[in-house]
Amino acid sequence: SIKFYKNGEGIILHEKSVIAIYNKSHTFAVGNEAYEMYEKAPANIQVSYPVKNGVIADIGNMQSMIDYFFHELDGKKKLKGAEYYIAVPTDITEVEKRAYFDLITNTNLKPKKIHVVEKPVADALGMNLDITKSTGTLVVDIGANTTEISVMSLGGIVLSRLIPIGGNRFDEAIINKIKKDKSFVIGEKTAEEIKMTIGSAYVTDESIDVCGRNLVTGLPSEIT
C-alpha cells in the first residue's frame, strides 16, 4: 500500500498500490478502486502492482499512480512547494532509491526539498519509539512481498534484513491450505480477507464464511 502523511494532519491518504490500465495505454483506475477490479477486470484492462519486492518494477505506471494521487490531494491539501520525505527499504541499491526520488521530482508539485529515508527509521518514528537509547529496538515491517527486520539503537540502524516473504505469501498459503483440505478454490482477494479478518499467530476458534468454487462439483459454493 501507499501512504501520504502531512505534518500536523496525519495520514491524508492510504490506498492500495495498484493501477488498472485500459487498452495498454490509458489509466482506468488507481489505488483501492483498481484493487477492487483485481481478478474481475475484462481482458482489455490490466490490473498490476507497480512496486514489487520493495522496488519500483514499472516506473511508468508508478508515475501515473503518483501523479493521480497528488492531483487528487493538491487542491485540498496545498502540497506544492512542500518538503517531502520518502521511506524506502534499506536493502535496495542507490539506483533503486533514486527511482523513488525521481517520482516526486517528475511531478508538477515543485517540491522544496526531497529526502529519501530508510523505512525502519520512519516506522519507528511513526510508532513513537525512542531509537536514540542505547538499548536495541526491533522493528518488523511485513509488506505485500517483503518483510524487513531491523534492529535500531543510538539513533541508527544496527542491522537490517529484507526477506522476500510478505502478506502475499500468507495469502498463497491460505489458498493452498483450503484447496488441499477442503477441495475448494478461493481467489487472492478472498484469501486476504480471511487473513485480515481472522488471521492470527495463535490458534483461535474464529471463523468466516467465504465464497469460491467446489473442485468436486465444479460449482460456485460457500464454506466456513
What are these regions (language model features)?
Residues N145:
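Conserved Rossmann-like nucleotide-cofactor binding loop
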Residues S1-I142, M152-T224:
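Nucleotide/phosphate-binding catalytic cleft detector across ATP-hydrolyzing
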